[in-house]
Amino acid sequence: MLINDNLEAMAKQLYDYWFVQFDFPNEEGKPYKSSGGAMVWNEKLKREIPSCFEVVNMGKLCDFRNGINYSKDETGNDYQIVNVRNISSSRILLDGEDFDVITVPTSKAENYVLKPDDIIIARSGCPGSTRLLLSSANTLFCGFIICCSPNDSSMRNYLVYCLKQLEGTNATTSGGSILQNVSQDTLKGLHVIVPKKQIIDKFNKTIELIFARMLNCLKESKALTKQRDELLLLLMNGQASVNSD
């Protein structure tokens, strides 16, 4: 959808402006770097960063786990499951309406149930592609996906865009090689800039408004699609006609 494409581009532009160019608003509301904010050289990143920021490995900020492997003949309870095709056919938000349903024992499923603040990352197929779930209730993730659980939930939106830098290139921080698969070790080893909490809080206020608008657009689009399909069915069955007057 064009509106959501524009909204997603806006969110990415905000992230880049604040955390790549470092022109987040300073205490006076002016762009930090452009207004002469203090910068220091970071040897890990080989670039300057704001003096009030730090750099740590992603593994210190999140827990990672691989998804569930299952067979079709298992018995137990029904669960929704996120597959790689759900990631590849979406942008940043997943609404769950197209998820498959599988049956597995609860004792097996409980280690793979997604939580509200989890981030999901494709291991293969579209390696490095990163998504958020609108609702994680009773939803598992498949073995070709890695789940990233931030230790601090307020960092989730920021970390999503840090991880989305993998999309397309999947370059490691050490060798810059292009990966066919993404592993937990690759993700844990990523060097991540950690902004001050008050800056993250300001970022969240804006990004959550954008996400809310994207969600509304998704709902509106699905409602219109449903109405269109129902009308087409009536037309095909001769139960409705188009007035040409």
Where are these regions (language model features)?
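Non-catalytic DNA-recognition/assembly elements of restriction-modification systems
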Residues: M1-Y17, S35-I68, I193, K197-N243
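Glycine-anchored helix-breaking recognition loops at helix->coil/strand junctions
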Residues: N4, V84-I87, C142-I146, C162-K222
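Secondary-structure transition motif
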Residues: Q21, E27-E28, S154
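Short coil/turn segments at secondary-structure boundaries
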Residues: G29, S71-D78, G96-E97, S174-G176
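Sequence-specific dsDNA recognition surfaces
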Residues: M39-L45, G59-E74, R85-P116
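Flexible loop/turn segments at secondary-structure boundaries
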Residues: Q80, S89-R91, G128-T130, V242
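A short beta-sheet element
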Residues: N83, V104, A109-E167, T173-I178, ...
